[in-house]
Amino acid sequence: MRRLILLIIVVTGIFVNYSLAQVDSHFSLFEYSQNVYNPGAAGSNDAMCVTSLHRQQWVGWDEGRPQTTIFSFDMPVVDVLGVGLNIYQDIIGFQQDLDISANVAYRIELDPGILGIGVGVGVINRAIDGNWRTWQSLNGGTVYQDPAIPHMESKIAFDMNFGATLVGEDFWIGISTTHLLRPTINFEVGLPSYIARHYYLSGGYNYALPNPSFDLVGSGMVLSDGSTVEFQINAKLLYNKSFWGGVSYRYDDAIVPMIGVHLINGLSFGYSYDIVTSKVGSYNSGSHELMVRYCFNLQGGKTPGRYRSVRRL
């Protein structure tokens, strides 16, 4: 029964989105995926940083559950420019998306902080394998292929993102748009689909507590595809600029405990676990997310774990 419910949800979501839109996958540790959805963040760490994020959503459902992986690289190249490269893979049901994009940001020093205005260009490869697993196929029979659904097709479309990020000593704020040109995917079978523009507003603030060993870090993000709105807020307690733990709330979806550490050699690790509060929560055991980041200070060796900017938390 759970597999049947999952199949209905996944297939309905995919093929309604065929002719309409697709919401970008969300990350609970969204602070570490900014380069993917906001090209203005390229180079904002003032270091060469390599970041990987992996999300396993709705663990406990055997087939069709979303799985998302991000690889991101960014660095400042001169005082006024930052560059980045992103590889993003999203798998859900029959559909697999692979996005590759390059970012460049122009950085302007202002009184409050450094403003980065960036553009990202790349390609989206969308593949569909519309094979239906029926009880006959699981018992040695033929896999059913619906003639109205693309089968073993893959198409590529050009994509563009735009964004701006302002980073200060104790705060950061960003605004961006992804899929600016609304790329269209035309398979040989079925209706043409387009990927809707997505709009992001995100920010964070580091509040120094009376005890100098502790900081309270708050952040939030609002995401909309023009028809739906999703928002998330995070609160973390940072100890000695190195160890942190906290909780996040994503409206009508999940409560998310999270932990992490910034090591002295430039390595950072983070983990979060989504306790799903929506109706699908009864059919899974939550979602897991893992982050690994390595930053290298181009001017003086490895970036220390004790960062001075909230952007690097």
List the predicted regions and their residue ranges.
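Positively charged n-region of N-terminal signal peptides that target proteins for export
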Residues: 1-4, 110
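Subset of outer-membrane beta-barrel
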Residues: 22-313
